[in-house]
Every structure is written in structure tokens, then in C-alpha cells.
Amino acid sequence: MSIKENSKIEFIDGDEGAKIKQYFHPHNTLNGINYSIAQFSLEIGGKTKLHKIKSSEIYYILEGEGKLKIDDEIFRIKKDDSAYVPPNSKQFIENIGSKYLRFLCIVEPAWKAEDDKILE
């Protein structure tokens, strides 16, 4: 069993432009998981860099609203929405709301720096 207290996890700066709290990842979990889950935060007007990752991702929006670009499609997302991002998709997410955009990102297989490529 592993419990992560949100208040005790420090934000790190992501290469793509977001603040990130890494909750579970194979490197910090003892039970041999193959996925990772992290909370991302974007300030008002913030946008991640265009990037692609070899893994599939699921976003679950905790707060705020945004614009999610996946390849050639653009989607509006808001609190309690979820989105599937296929592997190797060109993507970014932008905060278009009036408060922080916070979302969980589940990556399978787990996120690895060498699998994430910034495109801009």
C-alpha cells in the first residue's frame, strides 16, 4: 500500500511548460506498476509546448477549462471532462479559463523523458 499526500509533494517545472506533481511512477512505487499518474497545473493563459510522447495518455480535468489540441483536432475541456490522447500524437493543452487549469495525467506505459519530444 502506498499513500501520497498532495500537500507533501513538491511541484516541479515540466519541460513542456506546466507545473507537475508526480504521484505514482514505477521509480517511486514498490508494487511494480507500469503506468504513471501526475497532476499538472497551468496558470491563466498558460500553454504547454507542442510535443508528442510514445505512450498513451488520459487527462482528467480537476479544475478550470482549456483547449486541447490532438494532431489536427481541437477540443474544449472543462472540470470533470476526460480525454484520451493516443501514442505519438502531436499535442498541447492551453488554459483558456479564469483560474488555474489543473488535471491528472495518466500515462501508460509510464512516462519516460526519452519518450517525450518537444516539437517547438
List where the protein language model places each region.
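A short, N-terminal "cap"/entry segment at the start of jelly-roll beta-barrel domains
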Residues: 1-34, 118-120
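Conserved hydrophobic/aromatic beta-strand scaffold that supports enzyme active sites
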Residues: 11, 22, 37-41, 58, ...
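Conserved short histidine dyad/triad with adjacent acidic residue
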Residues: 22-25, 38-53
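Short histidine-centered beta-strand/loop micro-motifs
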Residues: 31-32, 47-53, 94-96, 116
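Short beta-strand His + acidic residue motifs that chelate non-heme Fe in jelly-roll/DSBH
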Residues: 48-50, 68-69, 85, 91-98
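Glycine- and acidic-residue-biased ligand/ion/polar-headgroup-sensing regions
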Residues: 56, 60-66
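Short acidic-glycine-tyrosine-enriched beta hairpin
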Residues: 72-87
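A short hydrophobic beta-strand segment most commonly corresponding to one strand
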Residues: 84, 99-114
